[in-house]
Amino acid sequence: MLLTFFYAANSFAQTEEAKCFSAFNELRGSYLKAEKQMTVSVSNSSGMTLHRLLHIYKDNKSISYWENLNGEIRGYALKGDVGFDFNQDKEYAGPLTWHQTLIWDRLFNSDTDLTGFSCVLTGRTRVAGQKVSLIRLAPKDSYRYGYLIAKDDVNAMPVELAVLSPNSGIITKITVNSVSPVDGLNLDLSVFDNLSEQNSVNNKEENSFLEIWPELNIPKEYKLVEEGEIDDNGVLVPYQLFSDGLTTFRVYKNAKTSVVIPALTNGTISILRKSSGDYEYAVVGEIPILFAESVLSDLPR
């Protein structure tokens, strides 16, 4: 009798999770082919910022153009997983850096693998005036961010994304405040093809021989995807970049300095510094601060 009850409960849980992932994949499909202009607010402990998001569908990929509405006309453009930063006021275009909204782009990209996450439909409510269903994506480990998504009951589009800490506190909330048709995207789309080709060549040259620094404690969900150096006032500082397909972080290894502020957080972005021997290590990226501490936990004192 007890075994029968256990198997029945397990079967029910698997069925409910399958329904949840089906609802989430429906949202991804709707978002992929949406051609919309949205006003989006991003709020966290540092305050709130407003953005304009232009989203179109091209070559079976989602193209997003995020523009800051606070001050300078700046932001980033993304096609699939290829993108770049821009600042129209300074006539600048350069490598893609971290942005709070990149988690939105990657999470709703149908190519992002969510193996290692469980899915639960937690109910219905209203968000930004819309009737929504709530989808909770929780990591099966204890160190990554979780996600609570509000899905529009009418058009299956995302209305809000809350990024959750490992203890379920809200780190950052991304909310769609208004939606309208796209007026037009003034962007040369060939730049994405050039970037994609360049990245493909670089990855073939680099990823075949990369090895994780042995002093780091990297969870199995994260892969080493890039290694390089940055110029810090004339000093070349080596780094390694890790990703689980949804979030990324870098580890820098520099000459030892006086660490004044060992840890900082800004929404989903954490920075942690730690000295070991003659070196100072810095973990920077879209991970909780406790996760960053774990990455450096094996360093000798």
PLM regions and their residue ranges:
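Gly/Pro-enriched, hydrophobic low-complexity segments
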Residues: 128-196
